Amino acid sequence: MTYSFGKELGYVRGMRRILPALAITLLPLLAAAQGTAENQQATFRSGVDLVTVSATVRDGKGRLVKDLEKKDFEVIDRGERRIINEFRSERAPLSLAILFDVSGSMDTADRATAAKFAAHHLINQLEEGRDEAGLFAFDSRLREVAPFSVDTRALKGALGEVDPFGATSLHDAISAAAERVAARPMARRAVVVLTDGIDTASRLTPAQVSAKAAAIDVPVYIIAVVLPIDDPGSDRATPGATRTAPASIGTIEDLARWTGGALYYSSTSASAYQAARAVVDELRHLYLIAFEPGAAPGWHPIEIRTSQKDFVVRTRGGYVAGPAGR
């Protein structure tokens, strides 16, 4: 893979929806995941435990909307409007679990080097001494390359320890990384995955992983390391090809969307930089919204709306109410 400056980021727009029936089948997994993280999440407290969701808002041109207030939002829970008990929009420290795919497929077309390039840009976007990141690698298992740290120089130095080898347990690794970052004290937390999207060895499906990450309100961002011909946003994409993701990327795009995250492409040095910047910028401008959970136990699909009808809000798909859920 040859990297040259001047190419634009291919950003995938539009929200894919997972059928409500899927959420019902995943209730045990959701409840277990939320029970694990219940005491770890940076949540609001107001007499009772509140459901906390993070949301990003974009206007009709895809630009982040950064100046909304509590009165501009409404929460719809199972078709009913909920009162917003707490609201935050101020800038806050970030905590990122940066997850490298080091499977054998990443050793072709220089994808591993491209992933390190994108990670370097991610770390450059962090504020020294304020934001933190941890580096993790996976093939058939998850491995900690560097613990969570605010020392960006140390994090960059650890990138040299990432080398491709083995099978791919992508979905399992995302699940494990989400649990790691959910334990961090920062309110703005996310998993950023650098991968070609090929999974050969996971036990968990993308739907199961997205349900687990959504349950603990950890958005998953995918930076797909692909060739320019496979990048829907590249002017070197295959002529006549539809502007859709390659087959190996489609399922993890759903995974990212369901958690409130997003999919970006990295096929050139410029698009790697743009993807890293877009992820961090979005996380810095999350709105944190808290409300009392519904009384009925089980899965609660939620929708966050704004008073501006042309604004698009992205957030997790719902939560589980009951003793184990939040």
Q: What is each PLM-predicted segment?
A:
Residues 13-18:
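Positively charged n-region of N-terminal signal peptides that target proteins for export
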Residues 33-326:
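Scaffold/interface architecture of coatomer-like assemblies
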Residues 20-31:
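Bacterial N-terminal signal peptides
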